[in-house]
A protein has these predicted regions:
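Charged, amphipathic alpha-helical coiled-coil/dimerization segments
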Residues: 92-154
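N-terminal helix-turn-helix DNA-binding core of bacterial DNA-binding proteins
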Residues: 24, 34, 38, 42-85
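Residue-level recognition of specific faces of alpha-helices
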Residues: 32, 57-63, 81, 92-95, ...
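Short, charged, intrinsically disordered terminal tails
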Residues: 161-163
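Short amphipathic alpha-helical segments with heptad-repeat character
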Residues: 27-30, 34, 38, 83, ...
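N-terminal leader segment of winged-helix/HTH proteins
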Residues: 1-51
Length: 163
């Protein structure tokens, strides 16, 4: 494990210098989480951009792919899964449908509803994009052992559950 100081250490040291009464441990944890999220967000955005889609668009197609054959969900199900408003979802669906990655069809069980399904082109693209995205994520973890990754995963799961 490296003892190198980083920018977050500098920030917490500055706070300690002016406010030694503060416990900056939460700042040290969340400052790093924010920086990791930003760096990984930028890296995955660039990765998915090579496939002509944004991270948000990737999330839509990936959610359909994960749903299993026939890779179909309603716009409402997609919105709920991705925590998006229906308006935000409509814009993504419009772009993805125009690109030929998905189709919207009337729901045969609900005359007022729609179903969203991945096209063959979308299926091929998402399978390549998810593999490429995992390679980006795997590369970011190269400094950790498998055991450290497992411990970190468990700690982050507990942290998330407590929020």
């Amino acid at each position: 494990m490296s003892d190198d100081k980083d920018a977050v250490d500098a920030i917490t040291a500055q706070w300690f210098a002016v406010r030694p009464d503060l416990d900056t441990a939460p700042m040290a944890v969340f400052g790093r989480i924010y920086r990791i999220a930003k760096a990984m967000g930028d890296a995955t955005e660039q990765c998915y951009g090579r496939f002509g889609i944004s991270r948000g668009e990737f999330d839509v197609v990936a959610t359909l792919r994960r749903s299993g054959d026939p890779y179909t969900l309603s716009p409402r199900q997609l919105s709920a899964t991705l925590m998006l408003t229906t308006g935000g979802m409509t814009g993504r669906l419009d772009k993805l449908e125009k690109a030929g990655l998905l189709v919207r069809k009337p729901d045969p069980h609900d005359r007022r509803g729609l179903q969203v399904t991945i096209t063959d082109r979308g299926l091929a693209l998402i399978d390549e994009a998810v593999t490429a995205g995992l390679e980006v994520q795997r590369a970011a973890l190269t400094g950790l052992t498998d055991e450290e990754i497992a411990v970190l995963t468990g700690l982050l799961r507990r942290l998330l559950a407590g929020i």
